[in-house]
Amino acid sequence: MRPLRPSRPPRPAAPRRGYTLVELLVVIGVMVLLAGVGAMALAGRGSSGAALSGAQSIVAGLVASARAQAALHQTFSRLIIHAQQPPAANALDAEMYLRRLQVIRRETLANGAIVWVAAGPAVSLPTPICVVPPAPVPTNHLRSGVSWNNNAATGPVSTLLTVTGFSYRGQSAAASNQFFDRQGQSGRIHYLEFGPDGTVVSNTTGNPTKIALTTAVLGGNALPAFDSATTVRGLFIRRNGAVAMVDSATGF
């Protein structure tokens, strides 16, 4: 008989690696963005209230995506909003005003140049939803008989930064800049910016950044006309990047 070999102890299972913060941010950003796209599709079939809710989900997804870009690439990122007022040379460009959004990130090229580059396609909010600009909301953005609470602390207005003459690259290797897919153009934007650690750096007040959304009368190569000071939703974005939904005009 052959002598029995001593049994070998079972090998310990390799510990399972947990998700890193960056991976979680990317996954959450993708999930929320997909949910927002689905909400946009559904919003197109319903009332303006459904469109407003869908737009709220879309913007929340874009905020999460911008934060994930900053953390993933260890750079600065922005969620930018088209703010070049009509009339425009092209009526299609006028339709982008306060309704077209995009995530971009800052990159350093091989030659040392620092540029802003699109981190994904631009997204349009469902009709008839617009981003409410920072206070004061211009009176020519209001339908006759509508008045707006322009208190930056408590009113349904966005607290974003604004810059004019802005342009960015569609891709890192692009030879020229663009503005919302219009090559060689530049324009005005409102924006929210994240730092490499995923915190908001465009707001140093200590208060959450607000993005307000409302319904408007749209049409032609003209300014939108906000038609209800009470039909407003939006978001609070805290300095650490956490997002809270705001579901009424008095919730801001």
Where are these regions (language model features)?
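N-terminal helix-rich module
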Residues: 2-7, 16-68, 72, 76, ...
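A short, basic/flexible loop-to-alpha-helix module at the beginning of a structural domain
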Residues: 10-11
